[in-house]
């Protein structure tokens, strides 16, 4: 098995430093919601993305650990993670531009609802987690995967 951490360390490093530097500011202001963006790959492993899967799983557990820390030190700062499936983004479109429509169809077939996530699906989850409507939600993951993890 060929393993490489190239690029994957950034996945956890950015979330770690985001939490580290946001927490004091949020405590000073009295409240806040940290939303770490992970991936469905942090919940459902794949055979060819070992480092990426591991890094995204680390973001999931970092979020849980920060949530528990905050719950014990201040009741007003929450921390959760978001785990979207493949989404219609410019990055994905660029990756697929060199391939046929077969690759897009293959991705869609992996998802029980047979379609990719829309950016709005992810944005709506972020808005919910950032709002007071989620004031009792901390230390959890929101999975936006069209049923992929239910299989």
Where are these regions (language model features)?
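Active-site loop immediately N-terminal to the catalytic Tyr-X3-Lys motif
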Residues: 44-50, 72, 114, 132
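Active-site helix of classical SDR
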Residues: 19, 55, 63
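Short C-terminal tail/terminal secondary-structure segment
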Residues: 44, 126-127, 138-151
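Short, small/polar-rich loop/turn modules that mediate ligand/substrate recognition or access, typified
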Residues: 71-78, 137-139
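Residue(s) in the substrate-gating loop at a strand-loop-helix junction
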Residues: 39
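Alpha-helical segment proximal to the catalytic Tyr-Lys
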Residues: 24, 68-72, 135
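Active-site loop-to-helix junction immediately N-terminal to the catalytic Tyr of the SDR YXXXK motif
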Residues: 45-53, 65, 95
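Single conserved hydrophobic/aromatic residue that forms the stacking wall/gate
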Residues: 1-7, 12
């Amino acid at each position: 098995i060929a393993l490489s951490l190239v690029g994957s360390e950034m996945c956890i490093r950015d979330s770690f430093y985001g939490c580290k530097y946001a927490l004091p500011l949020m405590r000073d202001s009295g409240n806040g919601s940290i939303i770490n963006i992970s991936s469905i790959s942090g919940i459902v492993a794949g055979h060819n993305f070992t480092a990426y899967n591991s890094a995204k799983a680390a973001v999931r557990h970092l979020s849980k650990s920060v949530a528990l820390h905050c719950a014990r030190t201040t009741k007003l700062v929450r921390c959760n993670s978001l785990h979207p499936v493949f989404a219609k983004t410019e990055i994905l479109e660029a990756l697929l531009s060199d391939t046929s429509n077969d690759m897009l169809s293959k991705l869609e077939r992996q998802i029980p609802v047979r379609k990719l996530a829309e950016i709005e699906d992810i944005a709506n989850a972020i808005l919910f987690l950032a709002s007071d409507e989620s004031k009792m939600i901390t230390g959890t993951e929101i999975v936006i995967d069209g049923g992929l993890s239910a299989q």
